[in-house]
Amino acid sequence: MKQSKLLIPTLREMPSDAQVISHALMVRAGYVRQVSAGIYAYLPLANRTIEKFKTIMREEFEKIGAVEMLAPALLTADLWRESGRYETYGEDLYKLKNRDNSDFILGPTHEETFTTLVRDAVKSYKQLPLNLYQIQSKYRDEKRPRNGLLRTREFIMKDGYSFHHNYEDLDVTYEDYRQAYEAIFTRAGLDFKGIIGDGGAMGGKDSQEFMAITPARTDLDRWVVLDKSIASMDDIPKEVLEDIKAELAAWMISGEDTIAYSTESSYAANLEMATNEYKPSSKVAAEDALAEVETPHCKTIDEVAAFLSVDETQTIKTLLFVADNEPVVALLVGNDHINTVKLKNYLAADFLEPASEEEARAFFGAGFGSLGPVNLAQGSRIVADRKVQNLTNAVAGANKDGFHMTGVNPGRDFQAEYVDIREVKEGEMSPDGHGVLQFARGIEVGHIFKLGTRYSDSMGATILDENGRTVPIVMGCYGIGVSRILSAVIEQHARLFVNKTPKGDYRYAWGINFPKELAPFDVHLITVNVKDQVAQDLTAKLEADLMAKGYDVLTDDRNERVGSKFSDSDLIGLPIRVTVGKKAAEGIVEIKIKATGDSIEVNAENLIETLEILTKEH
């Protein structure tokens, strides 16, 4: 395809509003353009990459018997009222009315629609299982769209739904999807982990997230590609090397979620769901009497600990939440942080929000900084992290401004429900006892759920089982963020390309090093001088030969300076660059492998054979 015929509006500079490298490069390389806040147009290059990813998905889903269909994006609100999500989904749901004043939504996901379609068509267990999916635009009214395609108001998603007559059958399909997702993301060239995930608004029970890992840009050998003019990093002057490190550091922010994983086992989980090895300890110290002490101007745990000369691990942090309009007290060891997802899941709450200062004062009789679990009103619900029950003679707020209590002992002085509600910390033991936890940043690219009967119960989707009994259909749900795949791939495959000019100056610029499977084209064929007829003829022949061998070819036929062509080529990021330059009359062309920066001159007649050898090596 001729580059002059495509819309590829590259920019000379990084966009000033971009915060992550994937967003910056997608805009600068002419892949996407923002139409309005959180809404993007996918230009030809991005669209080709997305279509290649769709092909990979379709091939893998066919292997597990998943069937593609297409549901509407505009949905009646009545279906969501049936499931109960119309009221509970939150402000992210796009709600609208038609000319008849009927309520509709723009679908952020399609559980209700697929459940209804199957409910109306399937009556017997003999018609199951069903395994359906679609690839479609979804809509979510994000309060603060950000990070390019990672947090948008319109996005492309693959959402699949399976329907079963029992949980054993669901387990089989769930495992099929897990393996299919691993195959898809592996083929897409992603470094990823399957981790324990949170079902969230989807209503799932068991779930697994697939996270594309986005490591820090500190390893020069990974993130920097040297031109053939530079033999090694050792040849780069120290001051230039420091500039390169600074450029990498400028784009260090990467990923949207933190994951915790074991250094010695397969354990991995989203930070929201991660836990650590816990060993209860028996109390050995005698319990002191409760005592009220004045702690003037002490509002935080560290201030209280310093004032009373105790370690923060001997203090109790007391928080108040409102869960579905009911107050809940949460307790932590003083140096720990609350994990609101764990707390919300334990409470099985639809809504969980921190209480306001006014609400806290009404409940405790004191303001923030002086709250504690002792002498609360009868019937108060207290949920404490499991570490709290190991404390002896702890310090907690006295529910009196400017005062705390010492000698606080769980069990004697208050009763609580003990459960894991804290955020894990790096370096703690993995919950399986093998290795310690390390943190990494990542981008969620896929999520699979065992929905069970969450939707079939609320929407009356039932079948007759083998015994003639009416039972709810058991469901699974399987999503892939198609548009965010583009961001994830670029986050992992962005590279800083460094070259040395004939005058000895060092220059560097960001570009993309697309994996072959997702690159919009396989080969970037560049004619240095489009006015040279010999070069033009050779380019045309090479283009035809490459296409005949199955290569997707982007031919740069523009009448532009060669420097601009090479800069655009680095930006666009195709795996192979073939340059028809000054030696065209001799039948000599240059091949450059983008991943390594290696280049070689070959006779044009040997181009295909050489490419086959080089691509096998890389």
Swiss-Prot record:
Record's catalysed reaction(s): tRNA(Pro) + L-proline + ATP = L-prolyl-tRNA(Pro) + AMP + diphosphate
Q: Which GO terms describe its biological process?
A: prolyl-tRNA aminoacylation
Superkingdom of origin: Bacteria
User: What enzyme class is recorded for this protein?
Assistant: ligase
Major site of localization recorded for this protein = cytoplasm
Sections of the chain in a coiled coil: none
Q: Where in the cell is it found?
A: Cytoplasm
What PROSITE patterns does its record include?
AA_TRNA_LIGASE_II
According to its UniProt record, the EC number is 6.1.1.15
Which Pfam families would you find in this protein's record? HGTP_anticodon, tRNA-synt_2b, tRNA_edit
Give the matching InterPro entries: aa-tRNA-synt_IIb, aa-tRNA-synth_II, aa-tRNA-synth_II/BPL/LPL, Anticodon-bd, Anticodon-bd_dom_sf, Pro-tRNA-ligase_IIa, Pro-tRNA-synth_IIa_bac-type, Pro-tRNA-Synthase_IIa_type1
The UniProt keywords, alphabetically, are: Aminoacyl-tRNA synthetase, ATP-binding, Cytoplasm, Ligase, Nucleotide-binding, Protein biosynthesis
Q: Give the quaternary structure.
A: Homodimer.
Q: What does it do? A: Catalyzes the attachment of proline to tRNA(Pro) in a two-step reaction: proline is first activated by ATP to form Pro-AMP and then transferred to the acceptor end of tRNA(Pro). As ProRS can inadvertently accommodate and process non-cognate amino acids such as alanine and cysteine, to avoid such errors it has two additional distinct editing activities against alanine. One activity is designated as 'pretransfer' editing and involves the tRNA(Pro)-independent hydrolysis of activated Ala-AMP.
Q: What family does this chain come from, according to its entry?
A: Belongs to the class-II aminoacyl-tRNA synthetase family. ProS type 1 subfamily.
NCBIfam families in alphabetical order: PRK09194.1, proS_fam_II
What the record says about its domains? Answer: Consists of three domains: the N-terminal catalytic domain, the editing domain and the C-terminal anticodon-binding domain.
Name it: Proline--tRNA ligase
* Organism from which the protein derives: Streptococcus pyogenes serotype M1
Q: Which gene encodes it?
A: proS
